[in-house]
Amino acid sequence: MRILQVFHDHERGGVQVLAETIEQGLSPHRIGVETTHLFPHPGLPAFSKLICAGRAARYIWRGDFDALVAYQGAASILVGVIGWLRGCRLRIVHQTCTPGATAPLIRWLDKLIGALGLYSVNIANSAATWAEFARYPVSYRRAMILIEHGLDAPAPTRHREEARRRFNLPLSQPLLLNVGRLMAQKNQELLIRALPNLPRAHLVLAGGGLKVDAYRALADTLGVGDRLHILGSLPPGDIADLYLAADLFVFPSTWETFGIAAVEAAMVGMPMVVADLPALREVLRAEGEEPVAFAAPHDVEAWIAAISAALAAPPLPQIAAIFARTIRRRYSRQRMIENYLNLFEREARSGQSEWRRSGVAATAEEVRR
């Protein structure tokens, strides 16, 4: 079986982490996964985007793939239309953005294409995400299913002090960690504005993006430039070490459909302050006490209070350990991959997809090997 995953661009983020996890999980089952991108980088002018989209459409058309998997709105539209015209029977789209945060034209086209039945499977990654589409046409929602993300728990390789030295971070001051692209949605500006009222804390931003210069300038203006550490995009191993090095994970996003970075931090038992969003309340729930505080994503004073309280009273180690085990079990990669294999098996049994593996049609039993 051959699958093509389609992204907007090469910029690393939670969606790329998800796709890599899916690829690694499916490969042992003799499922080949390829990846292509619509655009080489964000911020292209409209005409350049059209040219790039045309190239991606041509690649899809010529590829003769058994399944197409799209992440993000424009990729979903391309997969739905070109995949349907090409006769690819399994056209999977992931809802990685809430409708309210999607550009109006893309939102309208996505709704139209989904309502016309051009998506064969429409995946929501959380119940909160599914609820965002409650007002969409029934014909759109008919293809929706729930497959929660699954991740490998981060595996730090450095001790706390060693990791801090590795990234030139202070050894004895409280470290606040945020992981994610530097963009308006991730709302790191709020954390920088909170720093003047958190006099000992240092803020570590692990991610790249268009806001780097603006965030440095803001920190300098507020007099906290020496306590802001922007490390850029880092490989998973370095991120894992940062989870161990930091004292508190902070995640003030204005919207999330799942929150992969927050779940990763939870998997290592980090105490955290996160935005009070339905998706984050859902994915970070645990039986018993949780080392998680929620704050409104635009209330700087609430974040100052929540961060101060979390630093002053860290959770007991046993509470953090129970929390980590719960999240690891619920969002394991194995569980997610099993859900995808079940999906492919249902499609194989129903005869809706003519899969070829070395020129031979795949049976449902072969999919699970």
Identify the function of each model-found stretch:
Residues 16-21, 174-197, 201, 210-216, ...:
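A conserved mid-protein helix/loop that constitutes part of the nucleotide-sugar donor-binding site
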Residues 60, 233-234, 241-246:
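Short alpha-helical donor nucleotide-sugar binding micro-motif in glycosyltransferases
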Residues 70-76, 94-96:
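Short His-centered aromatic/hydrophobic patch
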Residues 156-169, 316:
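A short helix/loop element that forms part of the nucleotide-sugar donor recognition site in Leloir-type
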Residues 216-234:
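Nucleotide-activated donor-binding/catalytic signature segment of Leloir-type glycosyltransferases, i.e.
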Residues 254:
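Aromatic "clamp/platform" in nucleotide-sugar-dependent glycosyltransferases that forms part
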Residues 287-301, 309-314:
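Conserved acidic donor-binding segment of nucleotide-sugar-dependent glycosyltransferases
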